[in-house]
Amino acid sequence: MGKKKKKRKSSAFKIILNVFLSIFLVAGVAFGGIVFAMIKTAPPLNVQQVLTFDEPSILYDDKGQYMDKVITNEQRIVVDYKNVPQNLKNAFVSIEDERFYKHHGVDIKRFTGVILINVTNKIKRSSKLQGASTLTQQLIKNTVLSSEVSIKRKVQEMYLSIQLEKELSKDEILGAYMNSIFLGGNALGVEAASKQYFNKSVKDLSLIECAFIAGVPQSPSVYYPYSSASKKNPSIYLNRTKTVLYKMLDNGYITQNDYNKALKDLDSKKLAFAKPSAPSNKLAYEWFSIPAIEQVKKDLKTQYKYDDKQIHNLLVNGGLKIYTTMNKNLQDKTQNTINDAYYLNSYKSNGIIYPQASAVIMDYHNGEVKTIVGGRGDQPARSYNRAASYNYLRPAGSSIKPLTVYSAAIDSKKATAATGFEDSPIPNNIGRKYSSGAPYNPRNTPDIYYGYVNVREALMRSINVVAVKLVDKIGLNTSIQYAEKFGIPIDQHDRSSIASLSLGELHKGTNPLIMAQAYGVFGNNGTYTEAKLYTKVVDRTGKVLLEPKTNTKKVLSPEAAFITYDMLQGPVSESGTGPQANFGNMEVRGKTGTSSDMKNLWFCGLTPYYSAAVWIGNDNSSTVDGVYSSTAARLWGDIMKEFHVNLPYKQVQKPASVVTANVDRISGKLPTQLSYRDPRGSTVYNEFFINGTIPTEYDDIHVEAQINKLTGKLASKFTPSFLVESRVFLRRDYSPGVELLDQQWLLPYSIDEGGSLPPTEEKNNSNTRDKNKDKNKDKDKNKNKDKNPSQDKPNNNNNNNNNDNNNNTKPPENDSNQNHEDNKNKQ
């Protein structure tokens, strides 16, 4: 009986055992299948991805020197493994993975032990859990897998770690780990952490500094020394540092003496942290860097069809190398020149210096922009870029005239540099075309009218009413077309405003970058070269992503460009509005500009090397006191002087198709003998023309008339012969209603009606006659008349001069006998 019971118990045990074995076998097979499925869905191991770290893009100047870095919320500076101190390597291994050099990606012993500890803690309902990830696993997690917490991710992490150990050496794995790990604050990697905490390179860290950094990854926020908790209780991070040091001692990486000294240093507060600074979003050269980055973004979108998110990720994390056109040396000098311009009558408001100023200098031959300065003095991050932002446009004033008025007229052949105009108030028949109310009637600045002038002189003196008359002559549509060719932003309001197109009172405005590109046309055979802010963009593998071409378009004929270029020497001459722009012996051309109420002051110009534009004004568009457009010309000259150091003298070459001819500067027509006898001196000069535009008509403004030289009235039959004198005058067939500066040279309209001579004159004439009677009576009476100083001897001299002038093939372009007003502050 007893034997039967024992037999039954034995059979039952076997059955139960078999059942459990079967269950475990099935469970094992099932678990293995699940694990296999998890492994199968793991992403493929990309070793290059593991060794590649998210890095912000770097900008370099035109010499390949570091210039700026794209701002991100986190900073990473990749460091070469050989530059990491051995103490830091040993510290990480000791505290994070002490069997690192023995396992093959997964530490089975540690993994098993941690599982048992965590299960025990769970049973005890303890929240204290331990991790078992090796350095290799942490690297996989940081570079390949997501931060998801799941069994599946853990299995894939272990599998990929084993695979990675087959591909990389221990040094490569440890080096990649130290460059990828988050170390608190905004530091990614050990180099960024060294800069953040100790303001030094990782290679210069001490033992206790190495131990501190190695202790941070367990809980970066807890061990962050700048947190309020750590400031109140430094033992939080000090105890962690001591733990790392003990593990280094325990693993034989440091000696007992090293350990003791390190503890002593900690107790002596030798673990000194750098002064914390708030993460700055200000770039070192943000005036230039931000527009350059925007141009890169635009080109990435155009060439690769990337969306904004892809472009942002590429710039922030892609480690691109952006080679800009900026010259760091000249950028710094330009900034300093603008900052230190003592003649700008400066004052401060809310911490910002005023008036503000901005400048752009570019090589108009290849489009490379060398300098962008968007403001002067200390500026907050991402402040107004007054030089290059399309959100900060200002009216150009008279600096627009060479673009929309003078070059447009010459290129369209509707006027020449010699074409004559009358500088006088706008006639009502013209004014009514551009006003729904009272006729449009702009004034000159200052309120002076010169009378007869030609196009060249009108530009030199920046005569407003002539600019308006010329735009009326060529037509608003023609002016608009040229404005758009030059890249000037024209809105609907400007299209119907002659003030916008002739005087630069643009509704929105322009900026120095736009104007520097536009003025480059005059020195570049009429070709507009689009501004280029970078030359190349390279990805982290060295592949060239972008290499922009030089984009050009034809705006003017070479002939019109050269003639306008030559005319632009007028405004920088002593008789012009901006002679302060000149420097050295360099050939300078340019134009001042002032918008209404002195709110915006400009100088835009070029040399045979560079084009540049300078703006001065206040951010609130208020009147600028004590500063003029001539000040902008001076600032332009001071800046450009630095750009031309050691550059040889050079000229813009005249196209062979530009011809010359002698013309009358008053009428703009071919000269007559009277042109040489203008009472102010000869008005004949040699002018440049586009072939086929030389005038064919003769001067009809100069007229000759006989006058009573005593009264200045037209001579009549009542005028004594000895008072009759032949003189040359200007003809004007109407009254302009205001006084013109050439009015004194006009043909008189009053006729001499005779009358007695003044007593003194009668006496003198009587004495003269008596003396003549006493002389040889056989002499010719006409010869005696020649001796009388009241006779017309100056006419004979003028005739002699006329003969000389007729033999002169190229009279001087600027007549030094003319009386010029000092218009340095005039537009």
UniProtKB/Swiss-Prot annotation:
It is a single-pass type II membrane protein. The chain crosses the membrane at residues 19-39. The keyword Membrane applies. One of its GO terms (cellular component) is plasma membrane. Residues 357-641 are annotated as: Transpeptidase. The lineage of its organism: Bacteria, Bacillati, Bacillota, Clostridia, Eubacteriales. Residues 791-817 have a biased composition (Low complexity). This is Penicillin-binding protein 1A. Pathway: Cell wall biogenesis; peptidoglycan biosynthesis. It catalyses: [GlcNAc-(1->4)-Mur2Ac(oyl-L-Ala-gamma-D-Glu-L-Lys-D-Ala-D-Ala)](n)-di-trans,octa-cis-undecaprenyl diphosphate + beta-D-GlcNAc-(1->4)-Mur2Ac(oyl-L-Ala-gamma-D-Glu-L-Lys-D-Ala-D-Ala)-di-trans,octa-cis-undecaprenyl diphosphate = [GlcNAc-(1->4)-Mur2Ac(oyl-L-Ala-gamma-D-Glu-L-Lys-D-Ala-D-Ala)](n+1)-di-trans,octa-cis-undecaprenyl diphosphate + di-trans,octa-cis-undecaprenyl diphosphate + H(+); Preferential cleavage: (Ac)2-L-Lys-D-Ala-|-D-Ala. Also transpeptidation of peptidyl-alanyl moieties that are N-acyl substituents of D-alanine. Residues 40-827 are extracellular. GO terms for molecular function: penicillin binding; peptidoglycan glycosyltransferase activity; serine-type D-Ala-D-Ala carboxypeptidase activity.
